[in-house]
């Protein structure tokens, strides 16, 4: 079994829904493609059949990956999360020390739930790794591909 992954209840349920969809509808569609390609005769020179089999292989790998994630998932209850330091599932309010009027907010989540458009960043990202374990008032320097970012932690809370 792989490393533990930490998910919210919503994140866990989304993975279960995706798995169900892949195992029912998507798998059925792929099997229909294989059957259709098989009906065209000689399989040794049947590109359509080869493509359908490759799609099946990728689908089964994706199903296995999601099953492994679900099997190794720990569901975190936001009510149990402490806010004395930055942990997974905490939200942080940061002041950009290079542009004092810029305040940003992130919620630290697992890689599986990261969505930068929603302000959810992975604890494994450069920003997430730099923030984990820090407290209100701490100043952090975050190395990113474009250089360094400098922030002060203004608040830690759970949404």
Curated annotation (Swiss-Prot):
Pfam families: GreA_GreB (PF01272), GreA_GreB_N (PF03449). It comes from the Bacteria. HAMAP family: GreA_GreB (MF_00105). It comes from Chlorobaculum tepidum (strain ATCC 49652 / DSM 12025 / NBRC 103806 / TLS) (Chlorobium tepidum). The keyword Transmembrane does not apply. The gene is greA. Necessary for efficient RNA polymerase transcription elongation past template-encoded arresting sites. The arresting sites in DNA have the property of trapping a certain fraction of elongating RNA polymerases that pass through, resulting in locked ternary complexes. Cleavage of the nascent transcript by cleavage factors such as GreA or GreB allows the resumption of elongation from the new 3'terminus. GreA releases sequences of 2 to 3 nucleotides. GO terms for biological process: DNA-templated transcription elongation; regulation of DNA-templated transcription elongation. The keyword Coiled coil applies. Keywords: Coiled coil, DNA-binding, Transcription, Transcription regulation. Residues 43-75 form a coiled coil. This is Transcription elongation factor GreA. Belongs to the GreA/GreB family. InterPro entries: GreA/GreB_C_sf (IPR036953), TF_GreA/GreB_CS (IPR018151), Tscrpt_elong_fac_GreA (IPR006359), Tscrpt_elong_fac_GreA/B (IPR028624), Tscrpt_elong_fac_GreA/B_C (IPR001437), Tscrpt_elong_fac_GreA/B_fam (IPR023459), Tscrpt_elong_fac_GreA/B_N (IPR022691), Tscrpt_elong_fac_GreA/B_N_sf (IPR036805). GO terms for molecular function: DNA binding; RNA polymerase binding.
């Amino acid at each position: 079994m792989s490393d533990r992954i930490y998910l919210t209840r919503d994140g866990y349920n989304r993975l279960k829904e995706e798995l169900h969809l892949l195992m029912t509808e998507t798998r059925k569609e792929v099997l229909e493609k294989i059957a259709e390609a098989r009906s065209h005769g000689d399989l040794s020179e049947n590109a359509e059949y080869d493509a359908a089999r490759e799609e099946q292989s990728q689908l089964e790998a994706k199903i296995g990956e999601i099953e492994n994630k679900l099997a190794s998932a720990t569901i975190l209850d936001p009510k149990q999360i402490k806010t004395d330091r930055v942990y997974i599932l905490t939200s942080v309010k940061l002041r950009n020390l290079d542009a004092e009027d810029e305040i940003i907010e992130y919620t630290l989540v697992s890689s599986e739930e990261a969505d930068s458009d929603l302000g959810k960043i992975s604890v494994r990202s450069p920003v997430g790794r730099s923030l984990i374990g820090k407290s209100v008032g701490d100043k952090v320097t975050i190395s990113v591909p474009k250089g360094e970012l400098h922030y002060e932690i203004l608040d830690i809370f759970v949404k």
